[in-house]
Amino acid sequence: MSIITDVYAREVLDSRGNPTLEVEVYTESGAFGRGMVPSGASTGEHEAVELRDGDKSRYNGLGTEKAVDNVNNIIAEAIIGYDVRDQQAIDRAMIALDGTPNKGKLGANAILGVSIAVARAAADYLEVPLYNYLGGFNTKVLPTPMMNIVNGGSHSDAPIAFQEFMIMPVGASTFKEALRWGAEVFHALKKILKERGLETAVGDEGGFAPKFEGTEDGVETILKAIEAAGYEAGENGIMIGFDCASSEFYDKERKVYDYTKFEGEGAAVRTSAEQIDYLEELVNKYPIITIEDGMDENDWDGWKALTERLGGRVQLVGDDFFVTNTDYLARGIKEEAANSILIKVNQIGTLTETFEAIEMAKEAGYTAVVSHRSGETEDSTIADIAVATNAGQIKTGSLSRTDRIAKYNQLLRIEDQLGEVAQYKGIKSFYNLKK
């Protein structure tokens, strides 16, 4: 009854109006699962391959009909007949069928769509919530959200190099309360921006993209919004985080961090040592608790030096640096580079490999932050993954745009369903920091 009888993929649109995949899996019992695949704007060079058609006459070359065909004509034939509950066997079968180290033959987008749909079909068959199916009876921790309320870098037209300015309600007592704090700060920030005559249109992830005078102007404006909303900045209230996305402005030939790429003539050009000094200055000055991709993805010496300098005080998250890949994470652990990993399901391409990366991180004392992509859909699977793994943190955008709010609303439902069992750890989610 739990045997897969049909697998079907179609091309749909993501939050940027670009094509992506939606996959459906059906079983003998009538149980059904659907998965939709996200897409990134700033991508690590070591990520699994997102297969696009390349036909410039259709969706500017971004069509996904090849990936759709791979699901309908190759993957479907291979996994029909499997028990839908055997997630690992199905994921391993797809990896073997692809046969490349980066899923470049079938496409990570094709494989991931199936992987998510299989898990959802299994949960439907067992008549349990997805987070419960994936995580078992010990599922209880609601994630502390990283809320990207100001967009810069590749996610907006704002003249700021850092890609994301985030708030984290670490002092809240429940996820529901944390979400309210974030929403109130978001609206307070909008009011402040209007009063300054700054743009209040939002970027890809729902954050504002105003033309601030620089990084510090952005941080100080957010701090004013926190105060205006009636909260305090710091460990008992709301803390700040950055996604520097440093690989986006790192000049490989000159080996410098060239801020002029986004901030224009006269902006800083920093060596690795100067980049670390700059980040330390910001940490000393502001209530910053997390920095993502503070160094270029291939600047291993820089990462190690940054971790030695700030690793006991601040969460240093590897996104492009680790690309949700256990090989890169294992090296980072061995060389003591970073102390946290960003988890993006489409960087690696299956739920099995995603869970392996989270488990490896936790065993090494690294934190794991489950994350969306800038090109999202209404699919809320990452909310369930965050709770299923007791990850403790989630990064899924600002307090606007349905593609972001869908994840927050799912977390509200989960917290409600868990009732008294639910835990929101807030500042304790940063369990490997010394302060």
Swiss-Prot record:
(2R)-2-phosphoglycerate binds at Q163, K344, R373, S374, K395. Catalyzes the reversible conversion of 2-phosphoglycerate (2-PG) into phosphoenolpyruvate (PEP). It is essential for the degradation of carbohydrates via glycolysis. Keywords: Cytoplasm, Glycolysis, Lyase, Magnesium, Metal-binding, Secreted. Binds a second Mg(2+) ion via substrate during catalysis. It catalyses: (2R)-2-phosphoglycerate = phosphoenolpyruvate + H2O. Pfam families: Enolase_C, Enolase_N. GO terms for cellular component: cell surface; extracellular region; peptidoglycan-based cell wall; phosphopyruvate hydratase complex. GO terms for biological process: glycolytic process. This is Enolase. HAMAP family: Enolase. It comes from Streptococcus uberis (strain ATCC BAA-854 / 0140J). One of its GO terms (molecular function) is magnesium ion binding. The active site is at E205, K344. Its EC number is 4.2.1.11. Belongs to the enolase family. Its cofactor is Mg(2+). It is found in: Cytoplasm; Secreted; Cell surface. PANTHER family: ENOLASE.
